[in-house]
């Protein structure tokens, strides 16, 4: 994400040692528009899957999405007084929240509710009248509880199932394409 700081309030949340998502997220940040008109911001491909939350000061119409890795520049339209919270996972980590192939989410965003364990709880936390950092800490704890203990469990399970389905007649490159991981990581 690239943006000029004028017209926006930007807060980067500390994710150092002791944070519930330490070692699993690239970063967590909050952006709120102070502009009088809608602004468009570019989202640059970076290999990170993200949870994205959007709302306004009145905590009405809060939306939450699981966003897959993007391989093209996207445009994000931010309305006046609208905010976004981005929790960006390190490559390969975010998919352990889902139990589905990574390539199903490439260049897509799906609603958090109904697609991730703990989704309802996360939305209720966002509606609370508590400080931003506290809400993000609570959300992080819910994510940590629902994050599989090892992100590679998904990959191992998926690759094993595909190898059995194809009776061993599948190339590592095909597994990489299907799973969203690199052939080098799988091999």
Residue ranges of each PLM-predicted region?
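Alpha-helical bundle regulatory/interaction domains
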Residues: 1-173, 178-183
């Amino acid at each position: 994400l690239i943006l000029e700081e004028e017209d926006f309030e930007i807060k980067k949340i500390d994710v150092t040692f002791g944070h519930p998502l330490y070692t699993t997220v690239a970063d967590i940040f909050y952006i709120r528009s102070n502009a009088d008109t809608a602004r468009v911001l570019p989202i640059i491909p970076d290999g990170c899957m993200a949870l994205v939350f959007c709302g306004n000061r009145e905590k009405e119409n809060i939306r939450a999405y699981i966003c897959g890795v993007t391989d093209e520049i996207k445009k994000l339209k931010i309305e006046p007084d609208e905010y976004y919270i981005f929790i960006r996972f390190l490559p390969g980590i975010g998919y352990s929240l889902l139990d589905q192939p990574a390539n199903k989410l490439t260049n897509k965003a799906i609603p958090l509710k109904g697609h991730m364990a703990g989704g309802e709880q996360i939305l209720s936390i966002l509606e609370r009248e508590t400080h931003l950092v506290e809400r993000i800490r609570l959300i992080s704890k819910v994510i940590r509880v629902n994050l599989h203990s090892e992100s590679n469990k998904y990959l191992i399970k998926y690759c094993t199932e595909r190898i059995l389905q194809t009776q061993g007649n599948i190339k590592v490159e095909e597994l990489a394409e299907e799973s969203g991981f690199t052939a080098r990581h799988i091999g």
